């Protein structure tokens, strides 16, 4: 029965992807029906804020994005610092320590939601609502806006205006869908209140303080925007965030909704729907491979315990919630790292070595399917690399969407693809070379190395999940992961926008018999191979020293 539920869940991922992709294309490219519904409200926003609806250059678009995001980081930073004297603080929580506030503000603006604090004890209701939830809308709206400009550039059209796209992302996508999802979560038992904690009497007569809050509205945008941060420290293992299997499936659907839709949006916007389908199917195959790998490993149980003859019919149940079970915990772990959300319904630090390898690889690749917007930019980056390699092998100038890929584009892409592992491996090496980093490790040996690398991989990929055995709420970890999150977020977005702007100016080369097609299964295979090979070449030595070595040791 459990496998039937898994298949149905997978089918739901597939069935909603194309309709959502079509809706996104209409929402941003203009639709009379949508303009009639949302247009008056949007024009009012533009009038109040002084936004002019004109086409920007890629530099203007990128500058607008960085300045708006930077302003939001500063505002939210001071909310966190001053929350102790601000209203909506029934628990009288004090202001955040400076480096923690720095880390948290960047974390949520970068759509990472790395949390070096426990949500219910670290933030007031005001900080949760005005700080965290606000950024949970703004962060994915930023990247969804940028990916639309990116696709327009690839299609040879004007990039558009960042502030217009940002507003439309909020009004036409995130606010309405999150509102509906929040109502469903309330119906499923997720609390939504501004009242303080409830004191309950337990069976043995003791008193227990039960924390609550505006959780349902928080969870809806947490998953839809691929944010992932928890209202509670236990994240989606907490029964108030994720009461049962229905809420569990809904959360996974929300996580996958926009990332899986974007290939279809892209196909419609560039006039090649088949290429969009090829990208979707290719990535889904990689996703399935990851799910099969982690599930097989978790169902086989812990190798060390198996050697003692201990029964493991339920698989490795350490760190998992009984109400979700091993299979759906494995699926959730695959989804949350494939869609770069970072929400967890099981503790990733307790996964088996190979089970923990899958989330790590998903984040290292950062392209299956990746988070809202940012992940799709990486998908196209790998697609262009696949075309470039294919062109070199047959001695032709590589072309993508009928435009020649030349030195300028490849230099930008080369720098972008190297920057991600440089952040992960460079900062991991720094942490391992000083006691400021190693003192946080709770496990010696290979697993301790994986804890460190996982933290920086999660930060660079804007995922936010963690091997929580790492004691990371220290100035060193707050500052270094904050820098990694900021650089990992904005560097690739800006460089790839420059690539799209460069391709926009090029003329379309007529298709000939020798043109390498990017809308067939051959390209899909080369595309997958490029992702796997580039990822393996870059990160394989670290994976051998971490989870693979741990697995062999336990065996």
UniProtKB/Swiss-Prot annotation:
InterPro entries: KdpA. Part of the high-affinity ATP-driven potassium transport (or Kdp) system, which catalyzes the hydrolysis of ATP coupled with the electrogenic transport of potassium into the cytoplasm. This subunit binds the extracellular potassium ions and delivers the ions to the membrane domain of KdpB through an intramembrane tunnel. It is found in: Cell membrane. This is Potassium-transporting ATPase potassium-binding subunit. GO terms for cellular component: plasma membrane. Belongs to the KdpA family. It comes from the Bacteria. Its main location: membrane. Pfam families: KdpA. One of its GO terms (molecular function) is P-type potassium transmembrane transporter activity. It is a multi-pass membrane protein. Keywords: Cell membrane, Ion transport, Membrane, Potassium, Potassium transport, Transmembrane, Transmembrane helix, Transport.
